[in-house]
């Protein structure tokens, strides 16, 4: 079942206007939660993983931006942003190319650009007795006794004690915020 809620949109002066039915709440499948095959009987049991999604879409110029806050069954929160819409183009002489974009059709250049998003999360849901952790995976040096194959790593936790920025860029491999 999908449920829609009103949202408040602010203008450049900070005045709020209620917009009806602009926030969507729904549950969706998130792959396999767990699976096990009994090797004696050959029978398999599979349980699906579900996630609760709060989503809204905004239109800015020629793009629609989709923001989805996904709450999974293990207590994790994933913030997903997606862009859709129509690429803005400028004229380019036929047969020419540019370092500043890609020719997408004869005479049409889509300029190079990027989309940058910032997310603010208030972890004080249901009170202030919560803890936000940053977890980082660190490889453990090879050791003949404790790590002979070099595949051992450890998780180091850093408690976030005050408001600050955190780098959640995808290239930060091995980092999670929980």
Range-by-range predicted roles:
Residues 1-177:
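Beta-strand/loop-rich accessory regions of lumenal/periplasmic or secreted enzymes
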């Amino acid at each position: 079942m999908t449920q829609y809620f009103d949202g408040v949109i602010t203008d450049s002066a900070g005045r709020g206007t209620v917009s009806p039915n602009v926030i969507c709440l729904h549950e969706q499948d998130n792959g396999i939660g767990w699976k096990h095959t009994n090797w004696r009987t050959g029978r398999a049991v599979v349980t699906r993983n579900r996630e609760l999604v709060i989503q809204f879409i905004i239109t800015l110029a020629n793009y629609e931006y989709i923001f989805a806050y996904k709450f999974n069954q293990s207590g994790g929160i994933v913030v997903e942003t997606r862009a859709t819409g129509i690429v803005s183009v400028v004229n380019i002489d036929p047969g020419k190319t540019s370092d500043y974009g890609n020719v997408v059709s004869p005479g049409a250049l889509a300029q190079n650009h990027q989309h940058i998003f910032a997310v603010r999360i208030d972890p004080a849901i249901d009170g202030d007795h919560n803890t936000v952790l940053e977890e980082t995976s660190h490889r453990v040096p090879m050791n003949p006794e404790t790590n002979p194959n070099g595949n051992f790593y450890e998780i180091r936790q850093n408690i976030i004690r005050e408001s600050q920025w955190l780098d959640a860029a995808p290239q930060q491999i091995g980092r999670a915020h929980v």
